[in-house]
C-alpha cells in the first residue's frame, strides 16, 4: 500500500506551495507531538503557546519507571516520564516557571462561575478558552511498551500529584467535571480501563472519522464512542485517502476526504487531530492550511514556531 501511494505521487499535477499560513477565524489548538524530543520538553512548547504535550511511554518494572522515547532502541535512562514531563507540568502549574501561569490560575479555573459539571461537554471551548481566563493543559499519554494492562495502574499512580490537588478533569456521576489538566490515553491504552468505567479522571484518544462505531474491551463487550469518553479523536494524516503522505500539497480530492472525517467526529462533540505531517516537509503549511479550512481543531506538530504563525494576533 505504501508503494502504491508513493507511485501515485509521480502522476500528480504539481501544486504551488503556500508561502504563508492562512489567518484562521478561530483559535487553532496546537499539540506538541513527540514533545520529549524538544531541547527542553514541555517548556519549549509551553513558551511557544502549546497547551498539549505528548509522551511515548515505556514501562520498566525493574526500575519502576516509565521512560520516554519514540522507540525501545532510543531509550535514554536519564529521561523518564517524571523528569521530562510530570515535574515540568507541576512546576508550571504551581507558578514556579512562567509569569504567564501564576500559582492562582488552577484555582481560578476551578472556581469560575461558568465551570459547571455537564453531561454534554463542549471540548473545543474547553481547550480553546478554558475557564476563568485559564486554558487547560493536556497530557497525551501513549503506552508503547505493549503492556497496557500491566503498566496502566502505574501510570495512574504517577498522576497522583495532579489528582490530589483536584486538577484532573474527571467523569463522575454521569457528568464531566472540568479541571485545569486533562489526561488522555492513546496508543496502547487499555479500553478496559476506559469505556466501562463509571468514574475516572482520564480519557480516550478515539479514532477520528470512526466514532459511529464502538470500542471493544478484552471481554468482547462493546461500548459506543461518545463525548464523555472522547475529548480528542485522532488519525494518521497519511491514512486518509489522497493525503499525498504529507509530502506534497493536498490534491483537489483531499479536502473532501478530510472534511468527511472531521464532520463525523464533530457530530460526537469530539475534537479532531491528524498526526504524521513530516516536520521537514515543504508542503507542511499547505497540509495545515487545508486541515484548518476543513474545520479540524488541532495541529499536531514538532515545529514550535507553527503555533505563533497561525495564532498570531
Q: Language-model features: where?
A:
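Fungal secretory targeting signals
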Residues: 1-19
Amino acid at each position: 500500500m505504501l508503494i502504491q501511494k508513493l507511485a501515485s505521487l509521480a502522476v500528480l499535477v504539481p501544486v504551488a506551495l503556500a508561502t504563508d499560513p492562512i489567518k484562521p477565524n478561530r483559535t487553532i489548538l496546537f499539540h506538541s507531538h513527540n514533545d520529549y524530543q524538544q531541547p527542553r520538553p514541555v517548556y519549549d512548547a509551553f513558551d511557544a503557546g502549546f497547551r498539549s504535550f505528548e509522551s511515548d511511554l515505556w514501562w520498566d518494572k525493574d526500575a519502576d519507571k516509565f521512560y520516554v522515547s519514540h522507540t525501545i532502541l532510543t531509550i535514554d535512562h536519564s529521561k523518564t516520564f517524571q523528569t521530562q514531563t510530570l515535574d515540568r507540568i507541576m512546576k508550571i502549574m504551581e507558578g514556579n516557571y512562567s509569569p504567564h501561569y501564576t500559582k492562582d490560575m488552577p484555582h481560578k479555573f476551578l472556581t469560575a462561575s461558568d465551570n459547571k459539571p455537564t453531561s454534554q461537554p463542549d471540548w473545543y471551548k474547553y481547550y480553546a478558552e478554558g475557564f476563568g481566563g485559564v486554558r487547560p493543559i493536556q497530557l497525551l499519554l501513549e503506552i508503547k511498551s505493549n503492556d497496557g494492562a500491566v503498566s496502566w495502574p502505574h501510570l495512574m499512580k504517577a498522576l497522583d500529584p495532579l489528582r490530589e490537588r483536584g486538577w484532573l478533569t474527571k467523569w463522575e456521576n454521569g457528568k464531566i467535571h472540568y479541571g485545569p489538566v486533562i489526561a488522555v490515553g492513546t496508543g496502547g491504552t487499555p479500553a478496559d480501563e476506559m469505556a466501562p468505567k463509571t468514574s475516572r479522571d482520564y480519557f480516550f484518544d478515539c479514532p477520528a472519522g470512526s466514532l459511529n462505531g464502538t470500542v471493544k474491551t478484552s471481554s468482547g463487550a462493546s461500548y459506543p464512542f461518545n463525548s464523555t469518553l472522547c475529548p480528542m479523536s485522532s488519525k494518521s494524516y497519511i491514512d486518509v485517502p489522497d493525503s499525498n503522505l504529507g509530502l506534497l500539497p493536498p490534491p483537489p480530492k483531499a479536502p473532501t476526504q478530510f472534511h468527511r472525517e472531521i464532520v463525523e467526529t464533530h457530530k460526537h462533540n469530539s475534537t479532531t487531530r491528524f498526526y504524521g505531517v513530516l516536520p521537514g516537509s515543504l508542503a507542511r503549511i499547505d497540509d495545515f492550511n487545508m486541515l484548518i479550512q476543513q474545520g479540524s481543531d488541532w495541529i499536531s506538530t514538532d515545529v514550535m514556531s507553527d503555533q505563533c504563525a497561525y495564532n498570531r494576533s
